[in-house]
């Protein structure tokens, strides 16, 4: 998440993001009208800005933020409240979250995401990344009287074993499908398309299809290539994504999985006689992958079947969705994406948990956790829009710097995502 923007938590970043907050949209959807009872002292946009301050400022507590607002003029300016005596209290913030709900916060994020999707997503080689991150709950322990943890809807779940962390934790998980803005060449920029928050014991793979369905319903589009980790190995979910939406879900192969023809290794395909095969493309009409011998074969000249061998072989993806899914692992594109794109997800998760402070918030309920997770997505979207609207700096020594972010997917991606490609040479005769 390194960029030319000011550091997160500084007043300079707040001033930069201030004009990008959609105040008119928020006030129009949730108007500041009569309630039939106590009058609302603050418009919806101002309360939304106060919630953003809990992530964009060094104070990651709403209770402490309310107490510090009268002392911080820059924070009050960002929240739209210049008077010290007219700051919202904790009750107002709670009522605002109850009024918007998860659907309302998602609607705001979709409004922020719309120009990014229109500008960057409509490409044949758009790449999405999906993963889950752990959010430990502020839990005092397991209550024997109720049979539940003190944090509402918290559960015992597992996470990737890292130094200084235990294998299990009590809390929640944030599942996010992100889009890589590949036209931004200065650095890697990921924006969240859709996020879910569940108890920690919910499997990651079960939210793959709902995430793509939500993108298709909202934008009439979903990324044709999704990179995931080992938690999304389920063949049934991959088959559903391949059949309902022409989406290739790329994951690595588990070590105990068996190989199927034409694979002799997880990244190498070969004919029955041992000649290495190259992936030629996917025939969307027949639903088959075509593999062929290279231009200069090694074993075809000595093969006893050379006279009748077509040197091109078709395989359907149903026998193994990981090896022969929408995009086979033997293709150079799949290997390049898994090696280069997959590690980008960890810095994005680390930015939300540590710099935005999502991991430091007092998460004592599933509903509150979901609201703060969507607010973190809103902060990332605002930051991405501010970054894309700034002029791209061109260092004087740019020609001497190594290029580390090039990912040429044009030719291979076009062959993999076009469903009408006919790669069978016999059909032209």
Regions found by a protein language model. Give the residues of each.
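Nucleic-acid-interacting cores, centered on viral/eukaryotic replication and modification enzymes
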Residues: 32-33, 82, 97, 116, ...
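Short amphipathic alpha-helical "interface-anchor" segments enriched in bulky aromatics
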Residues: 18-21, 70, 263-283, 328-366
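Short gly/pro/ser/thr-enriched loop/turn and capping motifs at secondary-structure boundaries
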Residues: 255-260
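Basic, amphipathic alpha-helical segments enriched in Lys/Arg and hydrophobic/aromatic residues
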Residues: 333-419, 426-428
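Cysteine-cluster motifs in flexible loop/terminal segments that predominantly coordinate metals
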Residues: 265-329, 333
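Polybasic low-complexity intrinsically disordered regions
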Residues: 67, 93, 98-230, 234-246, ...
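Dynamic "connector" segments at or just before major functional cores
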Residues: 1-57, 62, 74-78, 84, ...
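Short helix-capping/linker segments at secondary-structure and domain boundaries
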Residues: 57-64, 182-185, 380-392
């Amino acid at each position: 998440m390194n960029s030319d923007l000011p550091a997160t938590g500084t007043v300079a970043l707040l001033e930069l993001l201030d004009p990008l907050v959609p105040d008119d949209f928020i006030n129009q959807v949730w108007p500041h009208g009569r309630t039939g009872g106590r009058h609302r002292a603050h418009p919806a946009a101002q309360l939304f800005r106060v919630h953003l301050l809990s992530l964009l400022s060094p104070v990651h507590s709403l209770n402490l933020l309310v107490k510090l607002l009268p002392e911080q003029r820059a924070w009050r300016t960002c929240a739209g409240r210049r008077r010290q005596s007219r700051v919202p209290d904790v009750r107002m913030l709670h009522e605002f979250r109850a009024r918007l709900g998860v659907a309302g916060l998602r609607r705001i994020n979709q409004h922020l995401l719309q120009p990014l999707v229109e500008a960057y997503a409509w490409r044949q080689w758009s790449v999405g990344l999906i993963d889950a991150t752990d959010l430990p709950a502020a839990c005092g322990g397991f209550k024997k009287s109720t049979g539940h943890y003190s944090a509402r809807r918290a559960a015992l779940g597992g996470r990737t074993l890292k130094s200084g962390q235990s294998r299990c934790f009590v809390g929640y998980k944030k599942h996010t499908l992100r889009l890589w803005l590949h036209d931004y060449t200065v650095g890697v920029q990921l924006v969240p398309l859709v996020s879910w928050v569940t108890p920690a014991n919910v499997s990651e793979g079960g939210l793959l299809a709902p995430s793509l369905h939500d993108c298709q319903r909202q934008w009439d589009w979903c990324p044709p290539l999704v990179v995931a980790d080992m938690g999304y190995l389920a063949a049934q979910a991959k088959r559903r994504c391949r059949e309902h939406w022409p989406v290739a879900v790329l994951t690595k192969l588990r070590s105990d999985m068996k190989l199927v023809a034409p694979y002799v290794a997880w990244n190498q395909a070969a004919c029955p006689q041992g000649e290495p095969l190259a992936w030629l493309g996917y025939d969307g009409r027949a639903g088959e992958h075509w593999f062929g011998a290279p231009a200069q074969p090694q074993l075809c000249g000595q093969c006893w079947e050379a006279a009748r061998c077509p040197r091109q072989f078709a395989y359907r993806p149903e026998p193994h969705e990981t090896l022969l899914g929408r995009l086979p692992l033997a293709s150079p594109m799949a290997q390049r994406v898994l090696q280069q794109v997959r590690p980008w997800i960890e810095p994005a998760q680390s930015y939300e948990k540590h710099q935005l402070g999502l991991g430091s918030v007092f998460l004592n309920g599933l509903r509150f956790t979901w609201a703060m997770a969507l607010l973190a997505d809103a902060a990332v979207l605002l930051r991405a829009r501010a970054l894309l609207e700034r002029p791209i700096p061109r260092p004087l020594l740019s020609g001497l710097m190594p290029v580390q972010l090039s990912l040429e997917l044009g030719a291979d991606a076009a062959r993999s995502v076009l469903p009408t490609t006919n790669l069978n040479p016999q059909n032209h005769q």
